């Protein structure tokens, strides 16, 4: 469980860093699109983690 928590924190930190890296975001882009795509891929990612 501790490993899953650390992976989750790593994903959150990576997402925040990537979303703040762009100084001028595209005004036409949906700001939640990246986050929602990560949430949709999360079960697929968790299924491929070792130790399950």
Curated annotation (Swiss-Prot):
Domain of life: Eukaryota
Keyword Nuclease attached: no
Signal peptide start-end: 1-21
List of residues that carry Proline amide: 50
Residue runs in coiled coils: none
Cell compartment(s), UniProt: Secreted; Target cell membrane
Pro-peptide positions on chain: 22-33
UniProt note on tissues of expression: Expressed by the venom gland.
A GO cellular-component term linked to this record: other organism cell membrane
Keywords for this protein: Amidation, Membrane, Secreted, Signal, Target cell membrane, Target membrane, Toxin
GO molecular function: toxin activity
Disulphide connectivity of cysteines: none
Function of the protein: Cytotoxin that provokes cell lysis. Induces leak currents in cell membranes in the same way as melittin, suggesting a membrane disrupting mode of action. Also activates DRG neurons. DRG activation and cell lysis is potentiated by phospholipase A2 (PA2). In vivo, intraplantar injection in mice causes spontaneous pain behaviors and paw swelling, which are also potentiated by PA2 coinjection.
Protein name as it appears in the record: Xylotoxin(1)-Xa1a
